[in-house]
Amino acid sequence: MSASQLPHPPRPSQTKIVATLGPASSEPGQIAELIVAGVDVFRLNMAHGNRDEHGVRLAAIRQASDELGQPVAVLTDLAGPKIRLGELPGGELTCDSGAAIRFVRTSPLPPHAPVEGRDGGEPKAERPTELTTTYEPLIDELAVGDRVMLADGTVALTVEEVGKDYARCTVVQPGLIRSRQGVNLPGVKLSAPALGAADLDNAVWAAQSGVDFVGLSFVRTPEEIRRLKSLLRSHGSEAQVIAKIEKPEALDRLGEIVEATDGVMVARGDLGVEIDIARVAVVQKEIIAACNRCRKPVIIATQMLDSMQHSRIPTRAEVTDVANAILDGADACMLSGETAIGEYPRQAVEMMHRIALATEPLCRRRPPLPEPDLDAAGVNQITEATVYAAGRIAEKLDARLVVVASASGATALSLAKNRNYVPTVGVSDSPSTLRRMCLYWGVIPLSGAPTGDSEVLLDYITTWGRNAGLLESGDRIVLIAGTGLAVTAHNMVVVHELA
């Protein structure tokens, strides 16, 4: 497609938006609507639905992206060793303070057993005050005094006795629980690996389906990340790994995990149950800072606009939460139930976009992000210096656009992490690289641009920019040619002034 045929000007939001697909947002028209509203990355949550359903969604995403001429990335989120309650008699149970509740041993489920959102397959309790779970070794790994948190921490139990096939608990924080809700064991080190049999199968499916990012849930060690990367590469996938920080063990090895991964998600739901909820905001800031030092994209997730599942307008606290995540240096904010099962998915995306637009001007007045740890980030020193200089040149010359040409996307990511506030366009001859740029702060991926010759590329960008109303005579463009693009275009900066 020629530059003159590209009708869609870049969105001004520099913060990227990740949206989870589900029953409320899976029709092709709905997906296209969400892209237009501002979605950069779609999340397929493997804890809900099945691969056939996700395959249909993936095809619809790719089709909408092609029709709109706009790259969009896909993140497949592996369920990981999430423990869930089995089926409860009647579907729910009121847990009164001081009541006795027993967990009873269940048989292990096969690797392809249905998970939440599918019919059947969950272990069933026989008595009202007995609970089963999807985690067969639970009884063996509990000890007297352990805390058990149910339903995102709204109900709390204390283990009083552990027998051969049961664990007797007392309710210390009452509330209502339902079938298939989550179970958290703060402080208990579980034997379950981050990649179980079902996760390995789903990772292979993700690799073969050509997704762009794979989320690894409940990460505890960098070795788990390297194992997933190796599996993806063995199936010919270029997908990058997003480590989800949800466990105290991950915080203990945060530096190693950030260094090993390609990106990070601050998964505040389980994290806020596994650690003291009062610490979540501080820990979020620490994780963002670690990612920025290592030049890794970081996504903030869970309950960002949660009330918009049922309301057209978010709470003031939610708006402030999104804004503060942006001010802290997050690259992306994520919507979960808001777009997957909510009543107003498009409005939720539009609201997040509006909050980003209102907040980003203040980012310019904030202290710069920390100096990178180049060894940990794996960033070439020449690339980092070139990108830094190009950003300063663009600001000094009041350039209208920065164009970064990058074969792998590394130069574009480095530019994003330098927080250059001049609108930035990323180009590459690799469609997968362009899609990965969808997660990079402030980088607008532009498909179809000729990358082999700098002069031809500048002509293309000039035509495109004029048609989009972004450029006029006398404006300046700064071009950065990234490492590996072409022999004559390694780490160079070109300033072009429109005639």
Task: Please place each PLM-identified region on the residue numbering.
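Non-catalytic helical/linker scaffolds that mediate oligomerization, partner binding
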Residues: 1-499
